[in-house]
């Protein structure tokens, strides 16, 4: 993966005290987080000590690691900008979704795929969608459901419950 040049600049891994510099640093980190998640097809991140060993927060070439407390500040800013969302509204907030594609973008991609596959009027299970359309196999069940709920609100699909009583598929109304 091609990393941004700032990733090799040691001060990038230290929270800057000057407000203007910190604002720029947060923006650079947000771009890096979105790029890293997109390249790794990761839509959620768990904030824990193991994360400190990942290439997201640790640059082994320059021996620098972004502290988790600073990472949390950056994530909070991403949440305010709708680039991320905590999976739980209550504390502790340890897991978040990263929107390197918005819910709407995911929905549009699914609709295009359904249209290209001639699926209008047919029924599709969540499993079938993620097995056949590899672009969305990185979405966890909850995030996929959020995307499909948006499509339902727009009148594109009708969610269907399986024998377990949980939503497990949908009928394509208009792709």
Swiss-Prot record:
It is found in: Cytoplasm; Endosome membrane. Keywords: Cytoplasm, Endosome, Membrane, Protein transport, Transport. It is a peripheral membrane protein. Gene3D superfamilies: Winged helix' DNA-binding domain. Chain C. Domain 1 (1.10.10.570), Winged helix-like DNA-binding domain superfamily/Winged helix DNA-binding domain (1.10.10.10). It holds the Pfam family ESCRT-II. GO terms for molecular function: protein homodimerization activity; structural molecule activity. GO terms for cellular component: cytosol; ESCRT II complex; nucleus. GO terms for biological process: late endosome to vacuole transport; protein transport to vacuole involved in ubiquitin-dependent protein catabolic process via the multivesicular body sorting pathway; septum digestion after cytokinesis. SUPFAM superfamilies: Winged helix' DNA-binding domain. Homodimer. Component of the endosomal sorting complex required for transport II (ESCRT-II). Belongs to the VPS25 family. Component of the ESCRT-II complex (endosomal sorting complex required for transport II), which is required for multivesicular body (MVB) formation and sorting of endosomal cargo proteins into MVBs. The MVB pathway mediates delivery of transmembrane proteins into the lumen of the lysosome for degradation. The ESCRT-II complex is probably involved in the recruitment of the ESCRT-III complex. This is Vacuolar protein-sorting-associated protein 25. It comes from Schizosaccharomyces pombe (strain 972 / ATCC 24843) (Fission yeast).
């Amino acid at each position: 993966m091609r990393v941004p040049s700032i990733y090799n600049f040691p001060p990038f891994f230290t929270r800057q005290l000057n407000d203007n510099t910190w604002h720029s640093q947060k923006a650079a980190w947000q771009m890096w987080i979105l790029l890293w998640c997109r390249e790794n097809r990761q839509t959620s991140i768990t904030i824990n000590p193991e994360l400190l060993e990942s290439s997201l927060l640790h640059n082994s070439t320059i021996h620098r690691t972004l502290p988790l407390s600073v990472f949390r500040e950056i994530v909070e800013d991403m949440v305010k900008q709708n680039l991320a969302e905590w999976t739980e509204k209550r504390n502790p907030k340890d897991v978040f979704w990263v929107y390197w594609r918005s819910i709407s973008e995911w929905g549009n991609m699914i609709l295009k795929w359904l249209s290209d596959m001639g699926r209008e009027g047919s029924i599709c299970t969540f499993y079938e969608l993620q097995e056949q359309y590899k672009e969305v196999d990185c979405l966890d069940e909850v995030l996929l459901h959020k995307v499909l709920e948006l499509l339902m609100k727009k009148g594109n699909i009708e969610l269907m419950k399986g024998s377990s009583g949980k939503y497990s598929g949908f009928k394509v109304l208009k792709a």
